[in-house]
């Protein structure tokens, strides 16, 4: 083989290695998750802030995708689960599908890696804009109705991605939370709005992410997870919400009467007595079938 041909092959091999390395840096979640940037801010609920989770490019990209499709935000009715406009939530927003483009897919990968929760358990990202005076009153992210819980179960966790800085206001506040004992009290309370001083608060900072769990470790809804978005006093707030369920949210619901198990762990859970301990999830009702009807001998 001539030296020129050998040199060409070597050049191509090196180029492929460089391209593969670059791809890993962009798309491999494990290469960009840095645990040292995470700090716990609350023990009840379990809440954590990841500093610099998103790049400026990722933040700006999500905003640009959302700008043309913003609509008035809605809330879920506690009785029937239907979405409705309410003064409780005055922002505007839109959903962005998980596979919208490579940047969005990369963000989804990072979220799954950080939370240790499958991508299919998450809803699409909801990008929100809060203008002057707009807010989201204190609420829970787990469900009170049986309609929404039928698809993927409760929301086990929420991640709030802060896409912009806010001059004043716009904090996320947990009114009933218990502060983490080893938390660094570097946050200057004087910089917080009056709303944020009513509990443990996280200031919106571009690129940061807030993860908190809506369920306790025994899967019971956590009353300490009550949280709200304080009114924006100066500036404009952009954020993105990722709600993550205990089961697959992408799964298509069927009511064809087939006696099946949705989760591969159903048989083991049934042996452990979960059919009686957690009948809503395992067995369900005639209107909303559970996820482990076969193993629970409910059909």
Swiss-Prot record:
Its main location: endoplasmic reticulum. Disulfide bonds join 259-299, 266-292, 275-296. Glycans are attached at residues 165, 258, 263. One of its GO terms (molecular function) is L-ascorbic acid binding. Residues 1-5 are cytoplasmic. Expressed in epidermal root hair cells (trichoblasts). Its cofactor is Fe(2+); L-ascorbate. 2-oxoglutarate binds at residue 237. Residues 27-299 are lumenal. It catalyses: L-prolyl-[collagen] + 2-oxoglutarate + O2 = trans-4-hydroxy-L-prolyl-[collagen] + succinate + CO2. Residues 121-246 form the Fe2OG dioxygenase domain. One of its GO terms (cellular component) is endoplasmic reticulum membrane. The chain crosses the membrane at residues 6-26. Catalyzes the post-translational formation of 4-hydroxyproline in -Xaa-Pro-Gly- sequences in proline-rich peptide sequences of plant glycoproteins and other proteins. Hydroxyprolines are important constituent of many plant cell wall glycoproteins such as extensins, hydroxyproline-rich glycoproteins, lectins and arabinogalactan proteins. Possesses high affinity for leucine-rich repeat and proline-rich extensins of root cell walls that are essential for root hair development. This is Prolyl 4-hydroxylase 2. It comes from Arabidopsis thaliana (Mouse-ear cress).
């Amino acid at each position: 083989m001539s030296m020129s041909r050998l040199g060409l092959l070597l050049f191509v091999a090196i180029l492929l290695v460089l391209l593969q390395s670059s791809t890993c840096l962009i798309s491999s979640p494990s290469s960009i998750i840095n645990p040292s940037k995470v700090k716990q801010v609350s023990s009840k609920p379990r809440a954590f802030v990841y500093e610099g989770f998103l790049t400026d490019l990722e933040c700006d990209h999500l905003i640009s995708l959302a700008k043309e499709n913003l609509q008035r935000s809605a809330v879920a009715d506690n009785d029937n689960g239907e979405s409705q406009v309410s003064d409780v939530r005055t922002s505007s927003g839109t959903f962005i599908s998980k596979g919208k483009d490579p940047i969005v897919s990369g963000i989804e990968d990072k979220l799954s890696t950080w939370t240790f929760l499958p991508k299919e358990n998450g809803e699409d990202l909801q990008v929100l804009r809060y203008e002057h005076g707009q807010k989201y009153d204190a609420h829970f992210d787990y469900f009170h109705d049986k309609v929404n819980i039928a698809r993927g179960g409760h929301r086990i966790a929420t991640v709030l991605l802060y896409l912009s800085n806010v001059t004043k206001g716009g904090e996320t506040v947990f009114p009933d939370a218990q502060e983490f004992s080893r938390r660094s009290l570097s946050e200057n309370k004087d910089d917080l709005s009056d709303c944020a001083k009513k509990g443990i608060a996280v200031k919106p900072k571009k690129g940061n992410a807030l993860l908190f769990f809506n369920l306790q470790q025994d899967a019971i809804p956590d009353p300490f997870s009550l949280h709200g978005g304080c009114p924006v006093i100066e500036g404009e707030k952009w954020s993105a919400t990722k709600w993550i369920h205990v089961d697959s949210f992408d799964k298509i619901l069927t009511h064809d009467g087939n006696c099946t198990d949705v989760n591969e762990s159903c048989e083991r859970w049934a042996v452990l007595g979960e059919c009686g301990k957690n009948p809503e999830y395992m067995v369900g009702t005639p209107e909303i079938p559970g996820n482990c009807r076969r193993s629970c001998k409910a059909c």
